[in-house]
Amino acid sequence: MMLIGEALIGEAPELAHVDLMIGDKEGPVGQAFATGMTQLSAGHTPVLSVIRPNLPTKPSTLIVPKVTVKGMDQASQIFGPAQAAVSKAVADAVEEGLIPKEKAEDLVIIASVFIHPQAVDYNRIYRYNYGATKLALKRALDGFPDIDTVLHEKDRAAHAVMGFKISKLWDAPYLQVALDNPNLPVILNIIKQLPKSDHLILEAGTPLIKRYGVDVISKIREVRPDAFIVADLKTLDTGNLEARMVADATADAIVVSALAPIATLNKVIEEAHKTGIYAVMDTLNTPDPVAVLEQLDVLPDVVELHRAIDIEGTAHAWGSIEGIKALAVKRSSKVLVAVAGGVRVDTISDALGAGADILVVGRAITNSKDVRQAADRFIEGLNKPEIDQFRIMTDF
């Protein structure tokens, strides 16, 4: 048996982060326990957990400092409140029945403990590490989190240290604002006026990228670190190279033209997936998007049904949505459909009713006298609440 648990509790600088393994003495955890006691590392010396001198806790527990111990003050925090907290938490887990008493001699625990170098309050160090150890033990023994929880939470999560989250398109529908004006100061001012929404995508338009190159993505990223940013290159050749350029520029998606050779389309999609970004196929001037898709090795993540600005007086091309989605089901793929060109507030329900997942809007927002109000009207038309808007956040 080898079970793994993790918990973070408290407030800086004394917050506690405990990772632990619990398992049989005769198994891999027991082997790691023995190795830890005999192969010491300067600054990370494992400590046998004792409730007080001459009274080790049961199951036997090894405490491993995560942060390099550089002086006696830090050593005292490990040997003092942290050791006492972990030892007491393990013993209490047995007393409370979390760990079966009859298993106390058969199991061992390895607990990696984080003590911030700026921590000073012994009381907080003890209480936070006690709580984190108990919670990590419970999670390990309960198998928390299960895979369904992981899949549910993975795109909602923002890592506390990183400070921002990488957005993914998993909660359609979305509003995509096309930033086509080739004037960067104007574009950055527009972005600052846009509302913050989980259902807002930013598109670095083709004219903007032609003027400033893909490095314009980093300028947009400075204003909106969390944004999902699409780089509309309308790639026609050198697909893998351009996909890599876009990924290196920190964009989240690259747009390739459906008019490109099939080999180029395949290379864009392959390289996009290698680098962890989305591949978008733009169907501008493509009479039969489904026929193009049927020739691809792997389907793109998004198909954009695009009516050009120069022909916006003509009818929309939303009729292809059903065929695209049917092909995606047949190929066991997930494909989002975006519609662009002439999308207005009064046509939102028509587009969504036809199966659109992303509404691409440009001048109706970017040329508006009140950018925020214009964007808000489209977002309200999506009729989609913010992710976790009504959720009361707990310990994870």
Swiss-Prot record:
Its EC number is 4.2.1.147, 4.1.2.43. Residues 1-161 are annotated as: Formaldehyde-activating enzyme. It comes from the Archaea. Pathway: Carbohydrate biosynthesis; D-ribose 5-phosphate biosynthesis. The keyword Membrane does not apply. Keywords: Carbohydrate metabolism, Lyase, Multifunctional enzyme. CDD domains: KGPDC_HPS (cd04726). Disulfide bonds: none annotated. The active site is at residue 17. InterPro entries: Aldolase_TIM, Fae/Hps, HCHO-activating_enzyme, HCHO-activating_enzyme_sf, HPS/KGPDC, OMPdeCOase_dom, Ribosomal_Su5_D2-typ_SF, RibuloseP-bd_barrel. Transmembrane segments: none annotated. Substrate binds at residues 19, 48, 66, 68, 83. GO terms for molecular function: 3-dehydro-L-gulonate-6-phosphate decarboxylase activity; carbon-nitrogen lyase activity; hexulose-6-phosphate synthase activity; hydro-lyase activity; orotidine-5'-phosphate decarboxylase activity. GO terms for biological process: 'de novo' pyrimidine nucleobase biosynthetic process; carbohydrate biosynthetic process; L-ascorbic acid catabolic process. Gene3D superfamilies: Aldolase class I, Formaldehyde-activating enzyme. Catalyzes the condensation of formaldehyde with tetrahydromethanopterin (H(4)MPT) to 5,10-methylenetetrahydromethanopterin. Catalyzes the reversible formation of ribulose-5-phosphate and formaldehyde from 3-hexulose-6-phosphate. In the N-terminal section; belongs to the formaldehyde-activating enzyme family. In the C-terminal section; belongs to the HPS/KGPDC family. HPS subfamily. This is Bifunctional enzyme Fae/Hps. It comes from Methanococcoides burtonii (strain DSM 6242 / NBRC 107633 / OCM 468 / ACE-M). The gene is fae-hps.
